[in-house]
Amino acid sequence: MAKKVFKRLEKLFSKIQNDKVYGVEQGVGAVKSLASAKFDETVEVALRLGVDPRHADQMVRGAVVLPHGTGKKVRVAVFAKDIKQDEAKNAGADVVGGDDLAEEIKNGRIDFDMVIATPDMMAVVGKVGRILGPKGLMPNPKTGTVTMDIAKAVTNAKSGQVNFKVDKKGNIHAPIGKVSFPEEKIKENMLELVKTINRLKPNSAKGKYIRNAALSLTMSPSVSLDAQELMDIK
């Protein structure tokens, strides 16, 4: 098994130049050529930012609705009450509730990919924060998932909203589509993501903002991208 995996990776590495830095357009084409799995692999972009997340004013976090979606069917849970529950259901939310939903989560129910809540329900959400937080599901105003405009938030989530946040080392990883997408759609998704991240550059960040960038598939090696080209995207 290990030998078979090694041979597959060796074959993939032979298709790209390890020391080559690709422009956006060429990079998308190169990473698509690495598709080898028997399923529709996810295309992911990885960015190393010149920020220090230990400082609150250098935490880069946000959300973007990709123009062509991620190719993944997203299940959405909503914490709301009264008329806001109806708005959530009409917008297509998969799970809607309040205290009852919190109890279900405590009992192990995590069959959703994104959680949205109205501000007045955050005390209820807080009861399951230790469960949702580590899974990256905790609603946050910066990603538009704590809002009174429930219908818009659910629609965005279903349309391909991607939430992102730098990790402790200043990295952001985000899906930008499936390998089956046409190159142009993957490129447009990536440009929209990078444009949003560039807008969020902290004033206190010094030096080069995007230090390294790469594209990869679920089962492929990565392709290096021109970080300067990405920083120039406005």
From Swiss-Prot:
PROSITE patterns reported in the protein's UniProt record: RIBOSOMAL_L1
Any one Gene Ontology cellular component term annotated for this protein: cytosolic large ribosomal subunit
An annotated GO BP: translation
One term of GO molecular function: structural constituent of ribosome
The UniProt record lists the keyword Ribosomal protein: yes
UniProt KW Ribonucleoprotein keyword: yes
UniProt keyword list: Repressor, Ribonucleoprotein, Ribosomal protein, RNA-binding, rRNA-binding, Translation regulation, tRNA-binding
InterPro entries recorded: Ribosom_uL1_bac-type, Ribosomal_uL1, Ribosomal_uL1-like, Ribosomal_uL1/biogenesis, Ribosomal_uL1_3-a/b-sand, Ribosomal_uL1_CS
One Pfam family cited in the UniProt record for this chain: Ribosomal_L1
CDD domains assigned: Ribosomal_L1 (cd00403)
Origin: domain of life: Bacteria
Quaternary structure and partners: Part of the 50S ribosomal subunit.
Family: Belongs to the universal ribosomal protein uL1 family.
Functional description taken from the UniProt entry: Binds directly to 23S rRNA. The L1 stalk is quite mobile in the ribosome, and is involved in E site tRNA release.
Protein name, UniProt field: Large ribosomal subunit protein uL1
Gene behind the chain: rplA
